[in-house]
């Protein structure tokens, strides 16, 4: 009898510890990062060269193969030497992207920020939407990303959350991930299949903070007006990432915005 009580007590204790541990993980997963204050090592910028960095998620990571093309486009339009560097993390949410801005080495983008580029293209949001992080968490960390860039004198170029086949993403995920996302959807009150609320929330954030004049915002409809359904030719077979044609179209749109902005600014 005593042995059974001991066994039951041990099992109960293990369950309790497991629940507490899961609770801490859950809390950390949805936690809001605090703003990190960084002191730049470099305080000078090469006025003869337009420097553009592309940071964020997988769209930034895979753009590295097209850096030379974007560089050529900008140089042809703006008539100034241009440097383009892309570095992103596949699957990164805005929280991770912000933290990477303060990390040196292969896993961070701090070294790119400290180049003091003229522009920083930011691709973020699709992974927040898929993981159901909620618009509050998404906008909080996106706001920190924008503030970090502006504090360094870098103009953000915000790429609106793209039109992709989100259902195709879910279909490829393991059952555990699907369950986790449904729980997250319930916890954050984020719709399971609708992602327009993330776009709307980001637009409102930019307007409310009155920073819309300090950045460039590129709606997805501006470079892909037909939307995902009629633009399969722009995406890879995974239904999520741009192929070469997609990047060429996006780069053309980015170039136009940089040309317009640089025409009104003297670097």
Please report, for each region that a protein language model flagged, where it lies by residue.
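Soluble non-cytosolic domains of exported or imported proteins
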Residues: 61-65, 132-140, 189-196, 240-248
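Short, solvent-exposed beta-strand-terminating loops
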Residues: 159-173, 222-223
């Amino acid at each position: 009898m005593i042995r059974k009580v001991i066994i039951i007590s041990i099992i109960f204790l293990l369950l309790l510890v497991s629940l507490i541990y899961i609770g801490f993980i859950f809390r950390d997963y949805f936690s809001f990062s605090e703003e990190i204050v960084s002191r730049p090592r470099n305080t000078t910028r090469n006025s003869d060269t337009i420097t553009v960095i592309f940071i964020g998620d997988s769209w930034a990571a895979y753009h590295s193969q097209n850096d030379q093309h974007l560089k050529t486009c900008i140089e042809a339009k703006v008539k100034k030497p241009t440097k383009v560097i892309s570095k992103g993390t596949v699957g990164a949410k805005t929280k991770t992207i912000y933290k990477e801005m303060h990390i040196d080495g292969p896993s961070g983008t701090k070294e790119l920020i400290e180049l003091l580029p003229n522009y920083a293209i930011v691709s973020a949001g699709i992974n927040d939407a898929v993981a159901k992080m909620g618009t509050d968490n998404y906008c909080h960390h996106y706001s920190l990303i924008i503030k970090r860039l502006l504090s360094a004198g870098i103009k953000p170029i915000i790429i609106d959350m793209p039109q992709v086949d989100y259902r195709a993403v879910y279909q490829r995920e393991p059952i555990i991930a699907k369950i986790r996302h449904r729980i997250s959807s319930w916890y954050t009150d984020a719709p399971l299949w609708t992602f327009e609320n993330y776009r709307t929330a980001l637009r409102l954030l930019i307007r409310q903070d009155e920073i819309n004049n300090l950045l460039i915002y590129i709606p997805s409809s501006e470079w892909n007006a037909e939307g995902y359904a009629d633009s399969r030719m722009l995406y890879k077979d995974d239904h999520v990432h741009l192929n070469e044609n997609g990047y060429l179209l996006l780069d053309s749109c980015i170039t136009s915005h940089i040309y317009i902005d640089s025409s009104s600014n003297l670097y």
